[in-house]
Structure formats: structure tokens, C-alpha cells
């Protein structure tokens, strides 16, 4: 007869990382598979106690005094006490002596000491950051970054520094300057530098880039993107949310991630464009000014940048007026304008164009009337005449 089935097998629990546990728990944490995984990934600062504290717990469990341990290990009582207090390191030699006298592997003590020294080194670096870099941290719109989930209101200044560097994926401030500050500054047009907050703009751009990494797309095809661009103007007829979803979907098919991120305080960007990898472009829009026609012109403007200026590391537009000295913006505006309103229709837009005629032209092109009204308002520098045709931008993200 078969033996009756035993009790159901229980899953092995994860190590309990309670600083109050005795050394057995620490051994399990270090030598178990779970503990090894934690060690590979790194652990919170208080995950393991200093070696001296664990040693004292071991002595207490065995009812051994420090003096007895000193005698058994042939070390001075003073040195044992210093190790217990954490004022002296637990050396490799002492670890071997503890292995012989207590039976605990020397590798256990060595790993404890290595982890402890690593933690102390991290704390020293954290303190140096806090002392030297608080001024850099405070240049950013902290509350807005808390609201966006980049930082936490519960973070200390040191933790905020670490989180912000990790957010930008850089190791230190010099790396931030090379990777973010210099490209962003170069991305502004000459006339915009006085109005630009480079720190808020860099954070806004990074938010968009982070979203773009999560957007699945085909490899970038500049020719296909340029070919499809005029057809995208039909999306202006849809609701904002439907249009943006379709825009993202169609652009992803040719390797362009289109992202939306409200501007941060101090960031006055309408849009930005960059190649985040050789096979993936990014168009980032902020919805600044909150008008439907401005949003769509901003998209076509940034799309034109990707097509016309693919070698520039990043391009940030605070406005879309074409005020630069080298003519790049004028060329970009002209390209975007033709894609949105073909030249044969643009030639019909004059000061004598009525709101009714503007609507007829929009229908002929296949765009929302506000797109034509926005162009007329810009050309005439009169933002009231066609205001009833222009509408506000609604929420475009779920």
C-alpha cells in the first residue's frame, strides 16, 4: 500500500531582512538564492547591519563574552570591542579566525564587511552631493517634477539629487552638462536664449524622451515620413483625442514617436524634435497656447525639422515665428505650411478672405476650418477676426 500523501509542500519564504534577527537570518539572506539576487541588485542602506553588530548577536546567541572571543581568536579584547562598535574594520585575517572559532564561514564575514564598506562609501558620496550640488538641484521645478512622479515629496535633498541624476541617466553634473545642458542650449534659436529656462526645458525634453522609449515603432524611414506628412492633415477633422491617437499610430509606422507633455514651469517650449537613436525620431509637443491650430502647426513644424535637419542633436522651439538669422526656421515653417495648407490654397488667403470663404477653403483642403483661420490670423496679425473658427485644444491623452 502506498504511503499516505504528506502535507502539501510549502513555498520557501523569502529571507526576512529584519535588523533585529540574529545572525542566522543574515546568513540565510546572504547565502540563499533570494539573498544572492538581492545582493546582485543592490539593497537598501539598512538591509544589513554592520559586521560588528552581527558579531555581537552571534556572541549573545552562544553566550560568549567579548573577552572569551578575544582569547579564542588570539586578538586583543580592545580590538574585538572596536570591531563590535564599528570603529575598526573586520579584516580578512579576523574573518578566518572567526571561522575557526565560531564555525561561521570567513566568506560570510568578508561579504558583510564588503557590503558595509560599500554602504559607507555610498553615504560619503551622497553627503558630498548634498553639500556641493544643492544649487544645481534647486534650479529645477521641483514641485512640478514631484507632480510628474520623477521625485517624491518625502525624498531628502540627497535622494532627490540621486533620483534626478538617474532620471537624466547621467552619473554626475559634468555628464549632465555634456549630455543635456549643451545640446539643449544649442537647440534653442538665437533669439530665444533670453526667454528659455534650460533646466526646465531639459527636464521636459527628458520626460518626452522617456515616453518615446516606451512607444513601439518601426525603424525610422525619412522618405516614407515625408511622403505621408501631407495626408496627416486630415486628422485635424477628428476629435483631439482620436486625432492624437491616430497621429501617434501612423507616425510610429515610419519610426517617429510623437509624444505629448505639458510644459513645466519655466519651460516655454511649443515643441521639440530629435533623433533619439539612428532608427527612432521624437516629436515632442506641449500644447502651449492651448489652441487646436497652433498644436497642429507645431507638429508639422517639428516634423519638418526631422526631415530637413536630421543631423542636429535636438531642436527646441519656444515659438514658431521664424526669427533666426540662419534661415533654418523660415525653411522649416515654409515646409510645414505647405504640408498643412498646400500652396495653391495658401495663395487664396488674403485680407479680403471672409470667415465663410475660409471655411470653404478648409473643406476643399480637407482640414478643420480653424487651421485656415489660424493661418489667416497669423498672416494678418489679427487674432480676433477669425476667432470664432479657431477652437481650444481639448485633452488629447486618455
Stretches with model-predicted labels:
Residues 2-9, 15-398:
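Active-site hotspot residues in diverse enzymes, especially metal/ion-binding acidic/histidine motifs
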Amino acid at each position: 500500500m502506498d504511503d499516505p500523501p504528506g502535507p502539501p509542500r510549502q513555498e520557501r519564504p523569502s529571507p526576512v531582512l529584519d535588523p533585529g534577527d540574529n545572525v542566522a537570518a543574515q546568513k540565510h539572506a546572504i547565502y540563499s538564492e533570494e539573498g544572492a539576487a538581492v545582493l546582485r541588485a543592490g539593497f537598501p542602506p539598512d538591509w544589513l547591519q554592520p559586521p560588528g553588530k552581527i558579531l555581537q548577536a552571534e556572541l549573545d546567541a552562544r553566550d560568549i563574552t567579548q573577552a572569551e572571543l578575544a582569547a579564542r581568536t588570539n586578538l586583543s579584547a580592545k580590538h574585538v570591542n572596536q570591531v563590535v562598535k564599528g570603529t575598526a574594520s573586520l579584516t580578512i585575517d579576523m574573518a578566518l579566525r572567526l571561522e575557526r572559532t565560531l564555525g561561521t564561514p570567513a566568506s560570510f564575514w568578508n561579504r558583510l564587511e564588503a557590503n558595509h564598506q560599500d554602504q559607507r562609501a555610498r553615504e560619503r558620496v551622497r553627503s558630498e552631493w548634498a553639500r556641493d550640488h544643492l544649487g544645481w538641484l534647486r534650479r529645477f521645478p521641483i514641485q512640478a517634477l514631484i507632480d510628474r512622479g520623477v521625485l517624491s515629496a518625502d525624498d531628502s535633498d540627497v535622494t532627490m539629487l540621486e533620483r534626478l541624476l538617474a532620471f537624466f541617466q547621467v552619473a554626475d553634473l559634468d555628464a549632465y552638462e555634456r549630455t543635456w545642458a549643451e545640446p539643449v542650449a544649442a537647440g534653442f534659436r538665437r533669439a530665444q536664449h533670453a526667454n528659455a529656462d534650460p533646466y526646465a526645458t531639459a527636464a521636459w525634453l527628458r520626460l518626452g524622451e522617456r515616453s518615446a522609449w516606451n512607444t513601439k515603432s518601426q525603424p525610422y524611414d525619412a522618405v516614407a515620413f515625408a511622403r505621408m506628412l501631407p495626408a496627416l492633415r486630415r486628422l485635424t477633422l477628428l476629435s483631439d483625442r482620436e486625432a492624437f491617437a491616430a497621429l501617434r499610430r501612423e507616425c510610429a509606422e515610419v519610426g517617429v514617436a510623437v509624444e505629448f507633455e505639458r510644459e513645466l514651469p519655466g519651460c516655454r517650449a511649443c515643441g521639440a524634435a530629435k533623433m533619439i537613436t539612428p532608427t527612432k525620431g521624437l516629436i515632442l509637443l506641449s500644447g502651449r497656447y492651448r489652441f487646436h491650430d497652433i498644436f497642429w502647426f507645431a507638429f508639422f513644424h517639428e516634423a519638418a525639422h526631422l526631415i530637413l535637419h536630421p543631423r542636429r542633436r535636438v531642436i527646441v522651439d519656444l515659438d514658431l515665428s521664424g526669427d533666426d538669422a540662419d534661415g533654418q526656421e523660415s525653411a522649416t515653417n515654409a515646409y510645414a505650411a505647405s504640408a498643412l495648407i498646400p500652396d495653391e490654397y495658401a495663395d487664396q488667403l488674403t485680407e479680403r478672405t471672409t470667415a465663410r470663404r475660409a471655411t470653404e477653403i478648409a473643406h476643399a483642403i480637407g482640414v478643420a476650418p480653424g487651421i485656415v483661420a489660424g493661418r489667416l490670423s497669423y498672416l494678418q496679425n489679427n487674432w480676433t477676426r477669425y476667432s470664432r473658427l479657431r477652437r481650444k485644444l481639448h485633452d488629447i491623452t486618455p
